[in-house]
Amino acid sequence: MGVLGKLRFKDQAFKLREDAILDATARLLAAKGFDLITMDDVADEVGLSKPSLYKHFKSKEDLVTEAMIRLLDGALAYLGGLPANLGPTDRLRSLLEWVLRVRLSGGLPFLPSTSAHVRAMLTHSLRYVTRALKLHRLLDAVVTDAKRRGELGKTLPNDVILYSYYARTCDPAVEYLRVYGKYDDDAIVAHMLAVCFSGIATAATGKVAQRVQPG
């Protein structure tokens, strides 16, 4: 093997090890949350020494930020790969199904909306913010198209729809259904999609609720 071949092999091995580290980080984030995981936990999960781990990531903050960036890259790639003729609501439904299945496989951490420290950490990463804004703009356009077609409620602001949609990606009901409801992954995904896009009230109940407003 020549020098270039050895360098390529070394780069590939480094990338594979980095992917394994990020996979382990996602699992630990889902199981323990940001505040409780340590670099020791990650090293043990991957089977690396801490010095080897620090060759890839200098801190827990760097590691978690990279895991979240990889998650956004995956969502952007999935959304971009959907058929061009797929309707806007079906695009939202398909992306949410992908996110839920990734999460159920242990690959998706809870979104850090409840952690001020993690929010501040991520907003200081230009690479993360750039991707988050890009995904938000793309989905905002999808929601606007869906409202124009009458597929989503026109009286709801886009932000209300989008932030409710984002919340479904980290809804604890997913874990409750798996642990206490004993549902399999397909059933959990189907039920979560139904709640998000169809709601829990019948059409008649919804009309009554609109008429009965608090005084």
Where are these regions (language model features)?
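Alpha-helical DNA-contacting segments of helix-turn-helix folds
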Residues: D62-L71
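Short, Lys/Arg-enriched C-terminal cap helix and immediately downstream tail that follows
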Residues: G33-F34, T65-E66, A173, A201
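Hydrophobic alpha-helical connector segments
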Residues: E66, L79-G107, N158, L162-Y165
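Amphipathic alpha-helical segments used for helix-helix packing
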Residues: S94, V102-T123, D140, V174
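Basic, helix-initiating cap at the start of DNA-binding domains
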Residues: M1-K32, L36-E45, D62
